[in-house]
From Swiss-Prot:
It comes from Xanthobacter autotrophicus (strain ATCC BAA-1158 / Py2). GO terms for molecular function: structural constituent of ribosome; tRNA binding. PROSITE patterns: RIBOSOMAL_S10 (PS00361). This is Small ribosomal subunit protein uS10. Keywords: Ribonucleoprotein, Ribosomal protein.
Amino acid sequence: MNGQNIRIRLKAFDHRILDASTREIVATAKRTGAQVRGPIPLPTRIEKFTVNRSPHIDKKSREQFEMRTHKRLLDIVDPTPQTVDALMKLDLAAGVDVEIKL
C-alpha cells in the first residue's frame, strides 16, 4: 500500500464516545506501525428545533431543543496490511458513525 492514505471521518452525538473511539483508532494504527495525522476536530453541526409548549394556544410560549453532531477526521499515512486488518477488526462504540475512504 505504498503512497496510499486512509481517511477516516467519525461522527457522533456524544463527544466523549467520539474521542474514546478516536483514541482507540490512533492507538491501533500506531501499534501496527502506521503514521497518523490528526485527530482534526471538524465543525460541530447544531440543529435547533423550536416547538410550542402548549398543544393548543399561546404562541409566545415556546421551547427549543438542539441536536449536536460532533465530527473528527483522521488520516493514516502509508498503512501496512497489518494496519488495515487491525482497523477492520476494531470494535467501536455503538453511537459512532465511521466513514472510511481510501
